[in-house]
Amino acid sequence: VSTTCESEGLPCISTVAPWQPWFIGQQGNPGDPASWKPFGYAYHFFWGLEDVISVYTNMWAQLSTNKQVGGLFPNDGDGNAWGDGKVGFPPVLSEKGYKLIDPGRYQNLSDDFSAQINAFKSGNVEVITGVMIPPDFTTFWNQAKQKGFTPKIASIGKALLFPQAVEALGKQGHNLSSEVWWTPSHPFKSSLTGASSKELADGFMAATKRPWTQPIGFVHALFEIAADVLKRVDDPTDADKVTAAVAATKLDTIVGPIAWNGAKLPPFAAKNICKTPLVGGQWRLKDSGGYDLVITDNKTAPNIPAGGKMEPIV
């Protein structure tokens, strides 16, 4: 959608994707950083790979491991970005003293992860990470258990965002870890309604009879930003005026402050990206059944309260 808006000269605001795959994937030559150019109409707010790597390694540092890490990266935009030797996990893990065992890219919806599991067992892996779709992680985790492979830590992007995906694993989902973008305990409120994060989540659960999920905050923030932008333009049909208003945004939202001011970004992405805070958490099995997501590391965003410490998978 962002690519189409850019080509048509229509202002666009997007979210819920790490900024590197979003930005780099839309470039004419993703493999040539020197050719990357900013966009005229497409703007994005979310965290980046540098943030998820920091969150994961901060969580891992709470437990004693041999620093052997297994990588699970699919052959898609996210997997290729996360596993990239220049901008992904490999160089940063190496800097931090971890050894990454990467068996290579696999196809989404694979039904056999024997090669990956065998590579991890041979490499004495105690930590696994990656970015998987939920059915693939379910397949991998069930097969790993069948083959007697249980790492101390499993920090997986994308697959573990929703409670339903973890509940599908039964009791085997206990202490799986993931990045955490938004929760009811985040200390932010809506600029539209004044509702706190907890009030927004409670309202969603009351209306839908379903558990809250992380994207709720970001979807709400899209409406906050759109309303704020339209309040600041005298002609909402003028694409260039609307785009200028987007670029000038300075708004405290339910997911944190939004401003496209280039903070904590490389020069090539400074115009079009706004970073949002990220922390890490573990899914904990409740005595009553089901799971709670507990924030276990907030070093990257100390204003977001932690609810516990990392525990090993057993």
Regions found by a protein language model. Name each.
Residues 52-55, 105-120:
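Structural motif
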Residues 19, 47, 144-220, 232-233, ...:
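Extracellular/periplasmic periplasmic-binding protein-like sensory domains
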Residues 10-16, 68-73, 124-134, 140, ...:
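Periplasmic-binding protein-like
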Residues 72-84, 135, 187-190, 211-218:
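Extracytoplasmic "Venus flytrap"
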